[in-house]
């Protein structure tokens, strides 16, 4: 989130930093970027380091009147390298490094706005821009119980396997005889 009145223009731009570009983060530290670091910008200036930390120049303060909420997904490898390059590891960078499900971005922003209203911290005035051009499809893996038992050294029935897989949010598709992983499970292919 950022203070709308500290931003210039209505644009949100994602761009690569210039080599040796300086930026002051929310913690008051000046950071030196290279051209691999992604920056979140308004119409005129950088206001945050993508997936890592916002800028001091657009921070929320006690006198904030209007906030802009942003939900995004960035490439985990880029965030990890950028975080290391600038010497700043944050909760945000840790989450992005592991990979986030872009399908959850809209639900996350909706929940943040809902909480703002429920807590009496503000009023949501609406309006959303979605620039996500793709969604992630669930991964599908051929279900081969015999092969699984051989690999694990077990003698589980097909039904037992389906039950166990269901406990970790993996669904069985009878029509295709496949295990379907939810989109947030990027580790299953």
Each model region followed by its residue ranges:
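RNA/tRNA-interacting regions in translation and RNA-turnover enzymes
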Residues: 2-189
């Amino acid at each position: 989130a950022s203070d709308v009145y500290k931003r210039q223009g209505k644009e949100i731009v994602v761009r690569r930093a210039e080599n040796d570009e300086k930026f002051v983060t929310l913690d008051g530290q000046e950071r030196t970027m290279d051209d691999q670091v992604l920056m979140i910008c308004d119409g005129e200036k950088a206001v945050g380091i993508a997936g890592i930390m916002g800028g001091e120049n657009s921070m929320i303060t006690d006198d904030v009147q209007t906030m802009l909420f942003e939900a995004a997904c960035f490439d985990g490898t880029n965030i990890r390298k950028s975080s290391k390059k600038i010497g700043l590891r944050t909760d945000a960078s840790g989450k992005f490094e592991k990979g986030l499900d872009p399908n959850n971005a809209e639900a996350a922003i909706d929940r943040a706005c809902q909480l703002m209203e429920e807590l009496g911290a503000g009023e949501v005035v609406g309006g959303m821009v979605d620039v996500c051009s793709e969604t992630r499809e669930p991964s599908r893996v051929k279900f081969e119980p015999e092969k699984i038992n051989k690999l694990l050294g077990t003698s589980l029935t097909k039904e037992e396997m389906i039950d166990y897989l269901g406990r970790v949010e993996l669904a069985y598709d009878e029509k295709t005889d496949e295990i379907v992983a939810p989109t947030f499970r990027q580790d299953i292919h």
